[in-house]
């Protein structure tokens, strides 16, 4: 029974698709005339009419209650009758698109030229990656290659890829002016007749690679025994490159291209290339896209900060990435010389592989790594330039409208304030602005979808009612792909997941590829019936594609099985891009069975949301408990601080009291100390006087002694003299006596 359903459903899809493909190509390729985009007044009239249209073409839109809508409806009566209006609104809401008219046949606008440059750089980068892998496989199996060097498919494929890379590098060097012209062009509505150059640019990177890779595959089939797993992986990579490049070629060769699709393709390609490179920062002009999405996304929907982004972008001057382009050309010249030295041999004779310089591959690989890094920088610059072009288109239309109105009224050219922008953008033009500015949201949703719903095809699993609860809880961390370590990170992740599931749910139910005008967090505050800007299901003139349904959805399945089947359903209802329908409006026509299918999916999503809400509440309770503990701890800390402050104050008071007492005692003892000092001074004076008196007395005594000594000496002298005189007298007397006796 299940197989029968699948067969019938597949037949139904085939019939629908056949009818779609057989529709009129003129109706299919006809888009919005460029006059609508260039003329802000007509564009704004479309927006106003759609805003007040009761039978709106925006699915899920609530009927307006604006009192000004009565006058607007009168103005738009005739316009609503025209089919051109419905087509214009359809294409405007799905993305800006150029009309396929005779005026621009054979010409491409700046955005398309930049897209072709991005595609060429992308293929150039993939060729470098394939060559690096081939070199690594050769280095890992050097000993085998030395033994079988003449007929080795690894060397053959490596030489062919080096020749392809050399031709690309030579082509870039010869067409430097074309690259510089694309990088330095200004954002204008004028078209440049460079289609032939762009086609040669694309064919240089794709067609030669395709033909040479086919020959490479034929050679590899002859030498399957020698070929290893690395070589097989290289072949798969090159084949994938061909497929992606062919898809890009078919998209580029269409008569008209969607500016929004252009922006989306490079964003998704760029996101895939740097999926594991956290150091790469994508910028919208000079504004980092990640910061805008994480911080300003919800405010941007209401118009806040919207024009700040535009003004910051318009503040830039000159060409972007000129230094990157110069480095790219210089490094490419070195790569070309290196490749020329290695690939001088004649590939027609396989015996020439004996002279293949294996030792030079290490140097070549190092140069390729540097070249790839410069190539990434150049590609980022080109993407930024393309986003600037789209921003300037929107801004120029608005400014020209304001200037024209001022000239009609005889007023000076106005300086437009942020409030004026916000008031008018809220009426509908914001849908288109966000379409151009935030196409990055699509890549984020695709990442979320890939993490929630795995893409692997697995068979149906048996129903296990006992394990219904465990898978639901375990499926929660896998929604984000990682399990945070801290509670705060877990809460933030769950909040983000719940918001994104609400956002994704609307995408699933309404089958709309445009970003949500009202995000989930704001829809709770505003009208719950406000939904994304999409198209009505009754538009039968637009083509679509389906993935084949693998198995049908069963409400009794286990939750893990349901999640996997939801992924299959999403793949089924995701339109493919090919050469016929990539630029047309993508709509989904659902049958009764499919509606039941989606309703069941919606119910399961609600269950997942409820479980996430329960987990969130538990975490909130847990964090509230932690907050209470933290509050108590903080209160204790505050009390301790208060006590410490009080004790410190008391100690200070005590110290002050003690110091005051000491000062008082010192002051009281001060006069006593003075008296004692005076007494001591007096005593010292008395001592000094006494010493002086004693000295004087001693001196006087000495003088007396000296005088006495002098007196004694004098007396002794006198005595001596007297004795001498007496002796003399005695001597004289005997003589006389002798004389007398003699007589």
From Swiss-Prot:
Not glycosylated. This is Merozoite surface protein 9. Residues 512-521 have a biased composition (Low complexity). The gene is MSP9. It is found in: Cell membrane; Parasitophorous vacuole lumen; Secreted. Belongs to the plasmodium ABRA family. Residues 226-274, 723-733 have a biased composition (Acidic residues). The lineage of its organism: Eukaryota, Sar, Alveolata, Apicomplexa, Aconoidasida. Residues 202-282, 459-487, 512-540, 666-743 are annotated as: Disordered. During the asexual blood stage, involved in the sialic acid-independent (SAID) merozoite invasion of host erythrocytes by binding to host SLC4A1/Band 3 protein on the surface of the host erythrocyte. Residues 1-23 form the signal peptide. Residues 77-235, 364-528 are annotated as: Interaction with MSP1 and host SLC4A1/Band 3. Residues 226-273 are annotated as: 8 X 6 AA tandem repeats of [VT]-N-D-[ED]-[ED]-D. It is a peripheral membrane protein. Residues 459-473, 672-722 have a biased composition (Basic and acidic residues). Its main location: membrane. Sequence repeats lie at residues 226-231, 232-237, 238-243, 244-249, 250-255, 256-261, 262-267, 268-273.
